[in-house]
Amino acid sequence: MTYVSENFWHDAVNKATTDLFTFGYKHIIKPHFIFNQTPDVAHSQMIDFCKVTRNIPPLMWLCREMLDYTDPILETNVMGVDFANPFGLSAGLDKDCEMPVLLDNVGFGFETVGSTTSRPCPGNPRPWFHRLPEYDSMMVHVGLANEGSAVVIPRAENAWTKAKSMQVSVSIARTNDSKTGDLDEGIEDYCISMRRAAGRARQAVPPPGQNRPSAADARQNAAQ
C-alpha cells in the first residue's frame, strides 16, 4: 500500500484540497445551505446528496484522491479489528445506511449505521432537531425513525463488503411503536435484528440508551 503521507505531491494536493474544502464549508456550505434552513431540512438534504453522489464513480474517485489521507501512524487495531484511522461516524446520523460510500471515499475509518429496529419505525413527530445556539449544540429526539433492519442490514452488508477501507457496523435498537410490549417482547425484538445482522457487518451494537414508550405505556400495550 502506498500512503498519501509518503508521496510528496499527493500529500501536497491532499492538504491543499482539504484546506479548500474547509474554507468552502465554513464560508459557503454552512451559512448558505445548512444554517439558512431548519435542521430537519438540512439533514434530509445531506442524506439526499449522499444518495446521489454515491452513484457517480468519477466523483467518488475524485473525493478519494483529494480528501482521503492515509498514514501508517493513523492505523490502529481494537479487539482484533483493523482500522485505517480512528476517525468515524457513530450511530444516529445515518439511520438508513445511505452514507457509507461517500464516507469511505473521503477517508472515514469507520461508520456505525442506524440505529435500526426489527420493524420499520416512523419515529417521533417532527421536527426532530432543535438548535441550541447558546450552547453551540443541538437537541435531538428522532425516536428511532428508520426503515427497519430487514432493509437497513442488507445495505450495511453491501457497504461493508464493498468498502475500500472503512469498517461498517450496525446499531440495533428496540422498535419504538405501538406494538412495544413487555420485557420478553423487547428481548425478542432485539434478537430479530441481531439474527439478521449476524456476519453481515463488522459488528452489531445495541445502544446504551434509546427513546421508546414509557414503562407504563409498555404495560398498557401488553395488556391490550
Task: Describe every region a protein language model picked out.
Residues 109, 114, 202:
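Short acidic/polar active-site loop segments enriched in Thr and Asp
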Residues 83, 91-94, 104, 143-162, ...:
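Conserved alpha/beta-domain cores
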Residues 114-166:
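A gly/proline- and charged-residue-enriched helix-loop-helix capping module
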Residues 15-76, 137-140, 145, 149-150:
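An N-cap/entry alpha-helix motif that binds or orients negatively charged groups
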Residues 99-106:
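A short acidic, amphipathic alpha-helical/loop segment
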Residues 3-23, 61-88, 153-165:
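N-terminal amphipathic alpha-helix/helix-capping segment at the start of soluble metabolic enzymes
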Residues 79, 86, 90-94, 114-116:
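Acidic/polar N-terminal loop/beta-strand segments that form early-domain functional surfaces
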Residues 38, 89, 111, 152:
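Conserved, mostly hydrophobic/aromatic
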